[in-house]
Amino acid sequence: MKSRESLIRLRKFQVDEKRRRTVQIETMIAEFERMSGELEREVKAEQDRAGIQDPAHFAYPTYAKAAMGRRENLKRSTDELRVQCDDAKAALGEAFEELKKVEMLDERDQQREKAEANAREQNELDRIAAMRFTANGAHA
């Protein structure tokens, strides 16, 4: 029984770790998207300031080119994180299923033990009742 409790604690710990990892990745994705949006606004502002919208133009602002490059890097990183997030969610689902299996086994064992205890108690009560009946039957 002790080993089952340890296994349940282990499975809960694994679920918590996988949940934390998933949240961490989702937070990183949100942060990268926020940063990408800021870079997009900065590029637009720089283009408006220079009056040049075409990145191929010889006088296109250097800062805008650099910001576009950083934005593209962030988008690639975000895409990679989305794949990691999907994998983390799948791992979380598997860990949760493993936890549920162990908890169900534990619950089934507890129900069986309770039924056995109830049966023992009922047998003891039946034995006592039979002794009383025999004792009272002998006096009548």
Pin down the residues of each PLM region.
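Charge-rich amphipathic alpha-helical interaction elements
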Residues: 1-140
